[in-house]
Amino acid sequence: MQIILLEKVVNLGNLGDVVRVKDGYARNFLIPNKQARRATASAIQEFEARRAELEKLAAERLAAAQAEGEKLNGLTLQLSQKAGVDGRLFGSVTNHDIAAALTAQGFKVEKAQVRMPNGPLKTVGDHPVAVSLHTDVSVDVTVSVLGETV
C-alpha cells in the first residue's frame, strides 16, 4: 500500500515521504495512530496544501522534546526495592516503574519511551537507562536502585 507519512517514522521515512508498506502495517498501525495517510491523488494534493502547517507542528514537537531533554539529561532517579543480602532484588525495576517515578517528578514520560537494553533491573546499584522523548531526542538517565533488606 502506498502511504504519505504525516510525521517522521523510524526506519521508514520523514514527513511527506510517499512510501510503500505492507497493508496490515498501514491499516492497523500507521493510519490509526495518525502517522500516515493513504496516498491517493486527492490526499497528496491536500497534504501539499497543509505541508507548511505540518512541518511547523513537527518543529514545535521537536523543540518541546529538546527542552524536556535538557531538563532530564543526567538526572539521577532513586528507587527503593526489597532486596536480599547479596544485592539481588526480590522482583525487578521495570520501565513502568521508571516512567511512574519520572511522572511523579513532573516529567511527561510513558513506559514505551523508557529504553532498557539489558531488560528489567534486578540488582542494587546505579544503572544507565535511555529515555526516548522524540525520534530525534534521546537522553540518558541514571537509575539508582536502593535495596531494602527484609
Curated annotation (Swiss-Prot):
The entry's keywords: Ribonucleoprotein, Ribosomal protein, RNA-binding, rRNA-binding
InterPro entries linked: Ribosomal_bL9 (IPR000244), Ribosomal_bL9/RNase_H1_N (IPR009027), Ribosomal_bL9_bac/chp (IPR020594), Ribosomal_bL9_C (IPR020069), Ribosomal_bL9_C_sf (IPR036791), Ribosomal_bL9_N (IPR020070), Ribosomal_bL9_N_sf (IPR036935)
GO MF term set: rRNA binding; structural constituent of ribosome
Disulfide bonds: none
GO biological process annotation, one example: translation
GO cellular component, one term: ribonucleoprotein complex
Pfam families: Ribosomal_L9_C, Ribosomal_L9_N
Family (UniProt): Belongs to the bacterial ribosomal protein bL9 family.
Function: Binds to the 23S rRNA.
Entry-linked NCBIfam families: L9
Protein's UniProt name: Large ribosomal subunit protein bL9
Species in which this protein is naturally found: Ralstonia nicotianae (strain ATCC BAA-1114 / GMI1000)
